[in-house]
Amino acid sequence: LKNFLDKFKFEYSFKSSSILYKSGFFNDTLKLILENYEGIMNIIIPTLGKERQKTYSPFLPICPDTGVVLEIPVSELDTKNSKIIFDNNGKKLEQSILDGNCKLQWKVDWAMRWYALDVDFEMYGKDLIESAILSTKIIKLLGKSNPSGFAYELFLDEKGEKISKSKGN
């Protein structure tokens, strides 16, 4: 990728989302997402199965004891203090969403990155078109325009097989 970008004299920088979460770079956008929680839920929930609808939250808290990302429902919101409240193994926890104490579910995370990084253009495989549509609705709810998009066919490896992260090809 770098060779391609350099060849055509693109200006670019690579950013680690983990570092951006932990450094507080995403904090203002995370607060905005918390303030728009219900609207985001109204966008995402209809796209989920009945069981997943019961437990879904855009926020995935990081366990304060283990550092593991918890895929558990959020029971309460504290928008004033930028906190979420959730039950972890029978223990009610209140935790900040800021400074790397949470991550976001994929489609909300994508919209957050577009928003916080002022993304102008986004390429994605045709398998992500539905995700791009939902992320577009979310960024518009947050008050910004979505980036111009370009959907491409999936890439094939030298054997003509679909490139897959899980296969490692």
Mark where each language-model region is:
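N-terminal Rossmann-like or analogous alpha/beta NTP/dinucleotide-binding catalytic cores
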Residues: L1-M41, S135-T136, L142
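Alpha-helical recognition segments enriched in aromatics with Gly/Pro capping
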Residues: N36-G39, P46-N169
